[in-house]
């Protein structure tokens, strides 16, 4: 997957999260979880764009670690919302959870590759 494709995928993920949460009920519990989810899901793309502008491999790795953490946090809040949802949003929340988990896997693999490259370049 190219950098531009991943930027587009992150953007699509954030937009789908935002559109889905508009369908959820509003109460204290949902509102608290939704606020956290909006922050983490939109941070995935924003922080990936920042990582793409990194000054060095080490800087890229540090920024990409934040991206991975935000994607994982999004998975957590999507899982909670899917579990407590009593409406017809379980399927969509499950689909978003799957996408979030795939993004986590992509970033974990990318981090592993970059760390190996950094090790090789030091030797």
Regions found by a protein language model. Give the residues of each.
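Short, C-terminally biased terminal segments at protein or domain edges
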Residues: 1-43, 47-50, 54-123
